[in-house]
Amino acid sequence: MALERTFSIIKPDAVAKNVIGAIYNRFESAGLRIVASKMLHLSKEQAEGFYAEHSERPFFGALVEFMTSGPVMVQVLEGENAVLKNREIMGATNPAEALAGTLRADYAASIDENACHGSDAPESAAREIAYFFSDEEICPRTR
Ligand code: RTP
Ligand code: MG
């Protein structure tokens, strides 16, 4: 299978828990490569734009407030089947339903503060990567 890219966020709760490295280790151990990465403190406008598809949902205000409550790490992950693989590493949206050993089972406190984001399809991955990274900021493997 060809290499695929996905977009990932380590959300403010997980950054506050000081588990950026632990989460990066999960990605790398699963064969995903970090090809772009940066720390950001999202503005309200950035968070609203990123989650625009949820703008009519009842949890939208709380989601934007949470996502702007502290710094996040945003990254591009590359590997075989990266979109699905990252979703498996993360576990279910609600940590109460997440399988043991997934990021959300281990690091998330609730469905509202659930440690990480991962694109849900290759199309959303492309859109989300472009939302946060220019082409020059992505450094694919050369050796
Ligand atoms: P994400 O986009 O953050 O990776 O999460 P996801 O695909 O697993 O879930 P999604 O349906 O896209 O929802 C985005 C985020 O909104 C919050 N949410 N809260 N209270 C609720 O019922 C509810 N549902 C979703 C979660 O923080 C979720 O990650
Ligand atoms: Mg989603």
UniProtKB/Swiss-Prot annotation:
InterPro entries: NDK-like_dom, NDK-like_dom_sf, Nucleoside_diP_kinase, Nucleoside_diP_kinase_AS
One annotated GO molecular function: nucleoside diphosphate kinase activity
Reactions listed under catalytic activity: a 2'-deoxyribonucleoside 5'-diphosphate + ATP = a 2'-deoxyribonucleoside 5'-triphosphate + ADP; a ribonucleoside 5'-diphosphate + ATP = a ribonucleoside 5'-triphosphate + ADP
SMART domains, alphabetized: NDK (SM00562)
Residues that coordinate or bind ATP: 11, 59, 87, 93, 104, 114
Highest rank taxon of the organism: Bacteria
Complex formation: Homotetramer.
Protein name: Nucleoside diphosphate kinase
